[in-house]
Every structure is written in C-alpha cells, then in structure tokens.
Amino acid sequence: MIGKSIKFILIGIIVILAASVVALQLYHRTSSTRTRSDQEYLALLKQVVGIVKKSYVDPVDEKKLVKGAINGMLSSLDPHSVYMPADSFKEMQVSTSGSFGGLGIEITVKDGKLTVISPIEDTPASKAGIRSGDHIALINNVPTRDMNINDAVSRMRGPKDTKVILTILRKGSDKPLVFPLIRDVILVKSLRFRTLEPGYGYLRIMQFQARTGMDLATALETLKKENGGTLQGLILDLRNNPGGLLDQAVSVANHFLGDRRDNSLIVYTRGREESSRHDFMASIGEKEPPYPIVVLINGGSASASEIIAGALQDHGRAVIIGTQSFGKGSVQSIMGLPNNAGLLLTTAKYYTPKGRSIQAKGITPDIVVENLVLNGKTNLESTPFREKDLEHHITDGTKKPVGPEQPEKPLSPAQPLPLAPSQKPDDSIKPIDDIHVPPKTLTDDQVKQDYQLLRAVDLLKGWELLKKAAKNK
C-alpha cells in the first residue's frame, strides 16, 4: 500500500516537472518570437526611413522624419498620448508651475479638427464667447486642419496684451465666426461660492488645483456661518470643469463620503503595470452633515470632475443634474526623454466605486436638464461632443477590471489627470479671501438666467418640503 502511494507521488512529480519544462520552452519560444517580431518592425522602419532619405523628391531632415514617426505612432493610440519636443515639454512645465500668457482654452483634436473641450472661466476665451465643441479653423489665418496640439498651443500662447485671431466653426452657424482675442496672464481660480437663498449654498469648482481641497473646506465653513451654522442644501457646480489634480478631486469627495467608522472608496485606477493600480479611499473621521447635495455637470465636465460626480452618485450622496459628461476616464503619465523631450502616455483607466468605467461614456445625470435660456428654445451647449467622438479614443472595454483593493495609504499623492495636453493645472492660486467676492462670483441676474441652476434650487427646496410633509403624516 505504501509502495503504491510512493509510486503515485513519483508519477505526479514527473508529470509536474514535464509540464514545467514544456511551459518554459513555450515561454522562451513566445518571448523569442516577440523579440524577433520587434526587430523585424524596427528593421522595416529603418528601411523606410532609408528609402525616403535616398529617393524622396526633395532633401529631407532625418530628425523631422523620426519625430513624424513617433507622432504617428502615438496618435494611433489615443488623443491624449503625445510626444513633446524640448520646447513643448518646457511649455508644459511653465503652465504647470506658474502663470502664462494665453487665451484660457482646453483643446483636443476631433476628426483632425482642433476642438474646444471647454473655455476656462474668466479668461479671454470665455469672456469672448468661445464654447465647448467649437472647432478652431484658423489661428491668425493659419489653417489648423491636422495641426499638432503642441503647435496650436504655442500659436495661441504668447506675451500678455498681444492679439490672436481665432476663426471658429460652430454648429448652427451659417458662416465662420471671427474672434479677435487679447492674450492675458492665465491665473485660474480654483473655486467660487455664495449663498443663493437662506440655507442653500452654491459652490462652483472651475478646476482641481493644488489648494482646491483646502479652499473647499474654508468655503463650506463660510457658507455655514452665513446660514446660522448649518446648510439645508448645497449645489456643487462642476460644469465646464476640465479636471486637474486627482488628489484634489479625492480631497473634495472626502468631505462628503465616509464617516468615523467607514473609509468609503472614491475611485480606483487600473492599468497593465502594477504601479498603475491605485485605490483612493475617503479618510475615517468627521464629515459634512448629511444635508442634500445636487451636482451640476455638462459636456465640459471631464476627468477629475467626473470622479467627483461618479463617487457621489455611486454612494447615493448626491443627485446629479445636467447633461452627459465628457467621458475622459484615462490617466496620463509624464515621462522624461533624452534631449529634454517628454512623453505623455496613457497608462491607466479609472473607475467609479461600483466599477463603472467613465472612459468614452461619461457620467449620466440622474435628472437630464438641458442648458436652455428661459424661453426654453435655445440649448446653450451648442455642440455636445464627448471623448467617444475623438479619433482613436480608448474604449471602456467589455471586461470589468479587477476590483478595488485596500490602499496602502488613503489620499494618495497628487497625480495630474490632463484632459488634453493643451495646459495643465496652475498651482499659483489666489488665497480664498480673493476668491470669495460675491459680486464677481454669481450675480442674482446670472442665477435667474441659469436654467440648470434654477432646477437644482427647485430640487433642494422640494426635498425640504417633502421631508416636512412626511413628518406631518
């Protein structure tokens, strides 16, 4: 009996060893095939470059050819992965670290056309009436068809008080619209706030920057003091918010999610490399009281702003009102290259707490409300377009990602989530005291003309009335 058992064990060991040898051989064969395939493609590229250099009708610059090959390779992946030569990489660092002269537009490329994702509030572009979805046909009479984003950005940036003429194609307009714009120093404010009516606060976040979380805390305290120490409801306006720093989006959500016992999941990212796998959790501690919250979004709400809307929606902490958001659910990493160049490469996608991919889908409002003028006929969101409309956009995929894991630390370090490589969040933010200037934040006349905002106020009031009605039963 013992002899038979030993015999079976030996046979099992032999089978396992044989399988291991076969698997190892297959691995080396696959690895060898992959290496040989890579070498063949590189040899083909080298051959084509050689033929072009030798036989093209005019002399060619080899450096230009290589850059073109790199740009072609990256543009075939997705709209957000780009190669940045030294000058463009330096421009990006300038826009990340301080003020710069420009127009205040977040841009991308759609079907070869330079397209506005959203104008940034209180910049020359927004003041002139540039809208989300506008196609920029000409910059100073230079056609932009198939123009590289970095080239477009460099043409629109420049010294303060200098002139730029944009020719815009807009859906619904019979002829091109010409916008003479004067460059200004772009100092993007993080947020603004005011009391709309007694008990009801309004807080608009324009972009997630290095101080957004701290500014939000100060704004909430100020609103509560203005309203007798508590709020009956809050409207969080994320319309035309192009995104920004991931850790600040997490910080904002952290004020409203979790409690002294629960560290709720806010968002998680998944990519091919282990370094791209992160779970972002709310910290355990005191949170805002459970007053009702309405979040406003539209087609210009992207990236980090979609994280907030998705997290609050999944946890049932807020009602989302407006139109479908942009659908930018991918994470870009910045990598340095030789000769001071850089690479912006998509390395992960992010997912809401319930595992929803935002990529190319966006956040669907709980209540769809178009942005109409008060006669109810005109939709101010003139050309709604989304991430899914961009050429070579990344799909959301058919498989669900591996679920969230316990994070090493809550509130992980800042990770930029750029919507388009046009400009990154500006860290030079004015103090909160400079931001809270009610006449400049949102006037009463502006409130009366904002149909989506009025619907949000009605919902909060109705919420309170329904609670009172339920108590009286």
Regions found by a protein language model. Name each.
Residues 1-234, 240-244, 262, 417, ...:
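Flexible, low-complexity junctional segments that flank or bridge functional domains
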Residues 5-14, 18-20, 25-28, 39, ...:
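C-terminal "post-core" interaction segments
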